[in-house]
Amino acid sequence: MGKVRSIDLLGFLCPIPVHETRRVLQDSEDGEVIEVVCDDPETLHDIPALCDRMGVILEKVEEKDGEFRFLIANVTGELQY
């Protein structure tokens, strides 16, 4: 696993978590892993859809006590916008 960058989006409702995740991914480097922590249940659909659109790998989704943790890998550095 490459360098991990965490973004805390607890308390924000969609579309903010998706926009912030996209912004961080666009700024990410080849091999970097982005950890997104949020509590909006809509992100369970929206973040995986964003990963599909951008061509990145959603490595893991975890839920604990109403919080969701996504691990997203930019494996190529060549994102689709």
Regions found by a protein language model. Give the residues of each.
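C-terminal structural segments of small proteins and small subunits
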Residues: L50-Y81
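Right-handed parallel beta-helix/beta-solenoid
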Residues: M1-D8
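Amphipathic, hydrophobic secondary-structure cores in small proteins
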Residues: L9-V61
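Intrinsic-disorder/low-complexity, polar/charged segments enriched in Ser/Thr/Lys/Arg/Asp/Glu/Gln
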Residues: V4, G31-E35, E67-R69
